[in-house]
Regions:
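Conserved, mostly hydrophobic/aromatic
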Residues: 18, 25, 36, 80, ...
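Glycine-rich phosphate-binding active-site loops on the catalytic face of alpha/beta enzymes
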Residues: 88-96, 136-148, 191-213
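C-terminal helical cap(s) of enzyme catalytic domains, especially alpha/beta-barrels
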Residues: 189, 203-233
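Structural motif
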Residues: 28, 59, 83, 108, ...
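N-terminal active-site wall of soluble small-molecule enzyme domains
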Residues: 35, 39-104
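Glycine/Thr-rich beta-alpha phosphate-binding loop at enzyme active sites
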Residues: 39-47, 51, 118, 128-162, ...
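Catalytic cores of alpha/beta
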Residues: 21-22, 72-82, 119-132, 178-196
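Hydrophobic faces of well-ordered beta-strands that scaffold small-molecule active sites
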Residues: 4-10, 33-35, 56, 64-68, ...
Length: 233
């Protein structure tokens, strides 16, 4: 059984407080930082980019969880200077050469993750299983923060978890991205999720401090050995 992981979505961060935010993340033992890369083509929005990843690595030792919402990622992987052990998610729908792309990520030292949109069946991963570190299940349509959970995705998570177990991959990670709120995260955990992308409805919720939100999410997803920290206002 994988240890639950919390991945703050930097699409939701207040960039004017980046240094303070990263300090809190380090103090709280955040597992990885979720970086959404959007090209305005695969999704109708632009976000972050290659230089952002490079600069971020200079500011914190926390590893990155790079989510490539871009067309033809197989032609652009070299732009991201992927570091050993970093998670890199590519969409099933983004390239006709998905197996080659996953292999290229692994060759660079990354941990390949296959991302699937809400309407994409989970079993498209069948022949890729030996090469994957995990599956990223989009629980909203990709492209924008603040959307509501697609209700059918909870059943999709249950079906995917059963599929992985039945095929001999019980330790493959299941990452969830989209409206991973305090309430939804518990349902997602019960459905089989192990990695949780926290955005405006959890980690960056305005109703409490950043550290308080993180501690609350840790409790929800079952992450143990939590340090009790003074709230950072």
């Amino acid at each position: 059984m994988n240890t639950p992981k919390l991945l703050p979505s930097l699409m939701c961060v207040d960039f004017s407080r980046m240094a303070q935010t990263l300090e809190v993340f380090e103090q709280c033992g955040i597992d990885a930082l979720h970086v959404d890369i959007m090209d305005g083509e695969f999704v109708p929005n632009y976000a972050l980019g290659t230089d952002f990843c490079r600069q971020l690595r200079k500011l914190t030792p926390i590893p990155l969880d790079i989510h490539l919402m871009i067309s033809r990622p197989d032609t652009k992987l070299s732009c991201f200077a992927i570091k050993p052990g970093e998670y890199v998610s590519v969409h099933w729908e983004s390239t006709p050469h998905i197996h080659r792309t996953i292999g290229a990520i692994a060759a660079l030292g990354g941990k390949p993750m296959l991302a699937i949109n809400p309407a994409t069946p989970y079993d498209v991963i069948r022949y890729l299983l030996p090469d994957l570190a995990g599956v990223l299940v989009m629980t909203v349509d990709p492209g924008f923060a603040g959307q509501q959970l697609v209700p059918a995705m909870l059943q999709k998570l249950r079906d995917l978890r059963a599929f992985l177990d039945e095929n001999g991959y019980p330790d493959l990670e299941i990452e969830v991205d989209g409206n991973v709120s305090f309430e939804n995260a518990e349902k997602m955990r019960q459905a089989g999720a192990t990695m949780f992308v926290g955005g405006s409805s959890s980690v960056f919720w305005k109703g409490a401090s950043l550290s308080e939100n993180i501690q609350r999410m840790y409790a929800v997803i079952g992450k143990r050995n939590i340090a009790v920290l003074q709230a950072v206002k």
